[in-house]
Amino acid sequence: MFTIREDTAIRRRRSHPYRRSHELAAVVPWFASSAYLAFLGYQNILPLNLSFALLSLTLGMGAYRLSNGLHILRARSLLSGRRMELMKFSRALEDFDDKSVCIGYGFTWLPEHTQKLHDLSRLNISTLMLPSFMHRLFNRHDKTQLPEEIGMPYLHGLDASEKTLRRALKNFEGGLLIVGTTQAGKGVMLNFIMTQAILRGDAVIFIDPKGSDRMYKAFCRACEKAGRGKPLRFHPGNRSKTDGIRFDVTAVFSTGAQIATRVMSVVPGEDNVFKQFAWSCIKTFADAMIELGEKPSLKTLSQNINKGIEDLLRTLILQAVKQHAQSDWREQAESFLPARRENCTDAIHELNVLVAWYENVLPAYLHTMVVGECLKIFHHSKEHYSKITATLMPIFAMLTSGPLEESLSPDPSDASDKRPIWDMESLVKCKGVLYVNLDSLSDNMIASAVGSMLLSDLTAYAGKRYNLGLNDVRISLYVDEASNVINQPLIELLNKGAEGGVYTTIAIQTVPDLAHRLGSVHAARMVLGNCNNLIALRCKDRETQDFVTETFGKTYIHNVDTTLSTHADTHLGMPSFKGGASHKRTAVREEIIPSEYLGKL
């Protein structure tokens, strides 16, 4: 009597599911024996008790072999994968849970699946595929992957059972990254997760650079099923004054610095002296307008920066004159001025008098920070200032040209424009659902600028919510093709947005796309490191594959090597034969999911 060790080649060969079903060959003899024994018992050739005992034994062995054989066939049937399914909305509602997020159907990947994948890599899988009619044995004739579908089918057949995969809603506070190549299913995944957010009653903002009509229809369908009416829609190229909405990106602010930050978020690249001075310039103009009771908008900022600081400075100092000046203030101020030049206009001379009075006559404790910042620009080199404004004006031109003039800088007094005016605060308070079609295929630069402005606006409002302790409404932000619009505010949302009630999901195609936008792979990895959750679809780029798999860890893969040896010795005149067999089991530490298989999903 002997036993086969667990690690022997014979035991592994018999327990291996990816092989010919030898067990079925033994089923026929066992069942034939059962029939023959039943006949012998019926004819009283064998004692009834003995016949029944032997019949039970043969039937049991036949059933055992049949079960093992069908198990092998089922495992081989699963190698044909699973067909892409279109889920009905009613079925999606069955899986809905407001405390968790459903991400689809599948199985938990364990080391045993890595072992199966490693074993399959040694085989010619095409020889293991079952004919179409045999899939009917397992009710899979209409569920196997179709030939025209992309991906290796056996990757989805490594486990016989699938279940609903869920993650607790709280886990998504740290941000979600969806990565996958073109047509790999990013839009479907975004739609599935976004639909659940709409059903939960979140304030939902979806930024779609491409402007997929299919995605918008899914957006509308989810809102209809949730009873939330038709979603809001913003399109930067919309020339209609009746369709869509106008969105005021400068409506919510605490200081002029926030407005300056939003505008400068459109400028790519790292901070430098130019960006710092340009930011300070925009901030000064915004603060001056706020001090005068005017609401800054992209349009009015562009107009004032183009004209210069003189008009705003004149108005600000005149306010101080009305409040604090004595009757002879003009004579006092002119005493500090040199003789008037011939080419000096009345307007310039008047402003010089006001500046002289403010700087030399008005007591220092009555000076204000806003006027002081305006005076810095006033005394600054005109040549250098013109260079700064010449670089800033193209940015404002992108954000205020054509339809964007009314869309991003709405005028409430314009009776001809019937579109409603929304801002980030009103959108969140009403738990609105906003679809942003950036139309990047038509104009990528405008799309990137508008997307960056909206993200900057949301970041500023998230900071306000955090400061005021407002977390009553959950804000779900979804950004498709994030490499087109990512900026520092979006990075801040990924890093700290949950504190302000913003839960961000971004989708990208490859890591190099993000690196190209941000300027370096290091910057791209820093952004991706802020995403605590990852959903990986089919990835063709090797750098992206490595980024995904390095977070999965490693496991041990077992190999059994068999060595057979024979030896013939006839030097003594008589043949002498010797033989031997050895088995060597090794374990190698490998990636739990090899990187190259991400390109075969």
Predicted regions span which residues?
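Accessory regions of macromolecular translocation/handling assemblies
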Residues: 1-206, 212-229, 291, 319-324, ...
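P-loop NTPase motor domains
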Residues: 2-7, 138, 147-149, 156-160, ...
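P-loop NTPase motor core of the ASCE superfamily
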Residues: 18-21, 63, 269-287, 423-424, ...
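Short, flexible active-site loops
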Residues: 30-32, 437, 477, 531
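Residues at the C-termini of beta-strands that transition into short coil/loop
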Residues: 235-237, 508, 538
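Short acidic/His/Gly/Ser-rich catalytic and metal-binding motifs that mark active-site loops
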Residues: 242, 514-515
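Conserved H-loop
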Residues: 509-513
